């Protein structure tokens, strides 16, 4: 902006810019308060210096520490969900490769039977990762695929079963019921397994990602 000094007007415009960027009100408030504190402590007067501080503050607020998933250490079933086109199948493949590299025995369930070529895509990822895949026919029952995959995971003593699923919105009742059916099968057939559900989101979605979740 064209501000020459750091004053209330400067902070008000900065707040508006951050909120318009869909950072969220709570995070914006934390960024502004942290910035004000640093400006006061360091007795900063120049806007150009404040801009550098702002970048550091935003990075600190957005920082996510790398943590191990619980399912890396337990016999687990991981359900991958999300809307269409966000990269669920690719995420399944990459996660499988990462776990395989750590010495885990992984099985993939191709439970996205709706999207054309989804099974072929996941098969390619399973080949790259060097892991087994359980698949049915395109247009088949996803719950049946998960049932077969759960039994295969138990029989082969797999460490992690990762289930790819079709893209769905939370307001599509039939697809959400399909997801509930899959969950019921896992709970019934593999109650001893640790459960994890991962939602894959588009990074440009912004605050609407909370609605999807």
Regions picked out by a protein language model, each given a short descriptive name:
Residues 1-111, 118-139, 144-154, 158-163:
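Primarily NTPase-proximal linker/entry elements flanking Walker-type ATP/GTP-binding cores
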Residues 24, 168-169:
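Active-site beta-alpha loop architecture of Rossmann-like, nucleotide-cofactor-dependent enzymes
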Residues 84, 166, 202:
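Short glycine-/small-residue-rich Rossmann-like dinucleotide-binding loops
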Residues 86-88, 168, 207:
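Gly/Ser/Thr-rich helix-start
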Residues 115, 167, 205:
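Short, glycine/acidic-enriched loop or turn micro-motifs at the edges of active sites
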Residues 121, 141-156, 170-213:
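Conserved catalytic-core segment of NTP-binding enzymes
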């Amino acid at each position: 902006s064209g501000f020459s000094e750091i004053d209330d007007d400067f902070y008000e415009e900065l707040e508006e810019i951050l909120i318009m960027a869909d950072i969220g009100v709570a995070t914006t408030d934390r960024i502004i308060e942290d910035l004000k504190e640093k400006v006061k402590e360091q007795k900063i007067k120049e806007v150009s210096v404040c801009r550098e501080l702002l970048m550091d503050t935003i990075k600190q607020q957005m920082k996510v520490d790398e943590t191990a998933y619980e399912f890396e250490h337990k016999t687990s079933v991981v359900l991958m969900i999300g809307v269409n086109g966000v990269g669920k199948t690719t995420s399944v493949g990459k996660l499988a490769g990462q776990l395989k590299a750590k010495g885990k025995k992984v099985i993939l369930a191709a439970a996205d039977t709706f999207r054309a070529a989804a099974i072929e895509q996941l098969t390619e990822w399973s080949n790259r990762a060097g892991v087994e895949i359980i698949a049915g026919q395109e247009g088949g029952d996803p719950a049946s695929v998960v049932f077969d995959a759960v039994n295969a995971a138990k029989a082969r003593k797999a460490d992690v079963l990762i289930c790819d699923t079709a893209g769905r919105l939370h307001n599509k009742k039939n697809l959400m019921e399909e997801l509930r059916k899959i969950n019921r099968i896992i709970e019934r057939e593999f109650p001893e397994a640790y459960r994890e559900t991962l939602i894959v989101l588009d990074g440009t979605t912004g605050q609407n990602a909370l609605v999807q979740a």
